[in-house]
Amino acid sequence: MNTKTFTPKSTMKIYTCLCLLFLAGYLVAQNNTSALLPMPNQITSVKGKPFTVRSGKTAIYLSQPELQFTANTLQNILSDRMQVEIPLASESDRADIRLLIDPAMEGNEHYRIEITSKRITISGATVRAVYYGVMTMDQLLLGDVCATTQKKISPVYVDDAPRFSHRALMLDPARHFLPVNDVKFFIDKMAHYKYNILQLHLTDDQGWRVEIKKHPKLVGKDYYTQEQLAEIIQYAAQRN
């Protein structure tokens, strides 16, 4: 067996390389754009102090009742990433995080994010657009983990709309059956990356996965009931 002796000089080189690798990882962690996927059309760093999330003081305002699910999603994101519970506010001037529908914006998936030291505004042409803005907000928090752990969000301006209206992924439960909760998990990940169409391949030689009440012998052991498929459709619709 060959052996190699490490001299002080070679050991120092190894130590230096390890330090550089650690520093590179640290610098990436400091960049709040490092987790953005897909990359927004426009993202601009803004000079100034970060926005600080304050438990008991920070609140979320939604301009329309249709944004309720989106607001709840943002509440869950802030709870998961920062361990803070943020309430909803009934009036705009009492909230420093605002979710707004702006019909003047062109394109039904066009959204903007404006983060300053005093306020966060996520606006979009539609409910769907605002939801995608919240997904980008989550990625900003993931990309800037050092600030996120301190309940701070770096100031930034984002203006984004998708290049393609059809953004699809396929699941194949016909060949490899997936429980309902696994399908929902996949939908959550699709929403995070702004995919908007899920194709479920439900029938093939390996299995028929759709319940047909008039033909019960079509299905085997693993299949989706009509109620489960309706549940999946509703779950996906909420996440656009």
Regions inferred by a protein language model and the residue ranges of each:
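Feature activates predominantly on carbohydrate-active enzymes
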Residues: 106-240
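Acidic, contiguous N-terminal accessory segments
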Residues: 12, 20, 29-162
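Alpha-helix capping and helix-coil boundary motifs
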Residues: 19-21, 192
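N-terminal secretory signal peptides that target proteins for export/translocation
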Residues: 1-12
